[in-house]
């Protein structure tokens, strides 16, 4: 892909970010918390966004543009911007992240990648957290896969370190529909018990074409506040021209 085409895609992603609402930092695959090991083709871009509302009246809105570059091997660079209300207080954070695939996924074999990043308060510039995670994916067949996440989180606001964990299952049960269920969380010491309790999400993704998909998700305790959540998410993709469709390469939506 030429430099001009790459700049055009990045500009489009940033333009969409300018008007999409944004939410609580989540280093993940769209609105799902457990990431897969796959990344897109070098030169491709996408914009993920989602709105989440909790029974506790907490609210989260997120926009996450990303592009895959190839300085020495493909690396996915993303800049998640989040705007959220928790216990009646609003906050905005920015979360840069870089993800690299180490071993490709395939049917009957384990693939894995590595990502790392941090989060910052958009108003004060304060460094809020740092994290590093290894996502692994085992494809059972062309339509089912298991995702495993393990990593580290440093919550600088309370100066505590946590072990991150997650397991998820994806099933593409039609050409346009995929079901996901996942459990995840962080292990360590916390003054708030719900922060270290397991978290849960399940939802359905509808992808009618190569460009657009939408997710509808139910979640429990997804940000450590012991509430029920409903999330509506979308993804807009900017594939490499004349490239093989993503779901043919990965088997999933």
Which residue ranges define each predicted feature?
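Bacterial N-terminal signal peptides that target proteins for export
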Residues: 1-12
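Terminal low-complexity, poorly structured segments
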Residues: 12-16, 212
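Intrinsic low-complexity, intrinsically disordered segments enriched in polar/basic residues
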Residues: 5, 15-18, 38-40, 164
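Transmembrane beta-barrel domains of Gram-negative outer membranes and organellar outer membranes
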Residues: 25-253
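C-terminal segment of classical bacterial N-terminal signal peptides
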Residues: 17-25
């Amino acid at each position: 892909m030429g430099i001009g085409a790459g700049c055009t895609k990045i500009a489009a992603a940033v333009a969409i970010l300018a008007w999409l609402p944004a939410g609580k930092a989540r280093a993940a695959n769209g609105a799902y918390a457990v990431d897969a090991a796959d990344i897109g083709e070098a030169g491709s871009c996408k914009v993920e966004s989602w709105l989440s509302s909790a029974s506790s009246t907490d609210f989260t809105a997120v926009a996450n543009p990303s592009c895959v570059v190839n300085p020495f091997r493909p690396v996915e660079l993303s800049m998640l911007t989040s705007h959220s209300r928790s216990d009646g207080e609003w906050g905005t954070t920015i979360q840069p992240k870089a993800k690299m695939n180490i071993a490709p996924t395939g049917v009957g074999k384990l693939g894995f990648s590595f990502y790392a990043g941090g989060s910052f308060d958009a108003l004060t510039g304060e460094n809020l957290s740092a994290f590093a995670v290894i996502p692994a994916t085992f494809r059972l067949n062309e339509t089912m896969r298991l995702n495993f996440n393990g990593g580290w989180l440093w919550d600088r606001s309370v100066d505590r370190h946590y072990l991150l964990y997650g397991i998820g299952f994806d099933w593409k049960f039609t050409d346009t529909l995929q079901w996901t269920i996942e459990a995840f969380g962080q292990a360590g010491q916390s003054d708030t018990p719900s922060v270290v309790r397991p978290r849960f999400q399940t939802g359905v993704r509808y992808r009618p074409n190569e460009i657009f998909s939408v997710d509808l998700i139910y979640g429990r305790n997804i940000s450590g506040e012991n509430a029920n959540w409903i999330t509506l998410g979308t993804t807009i993709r900017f594939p490499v021209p004349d490239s093989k469709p993503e779901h043919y390469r990965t088997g999933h939506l």
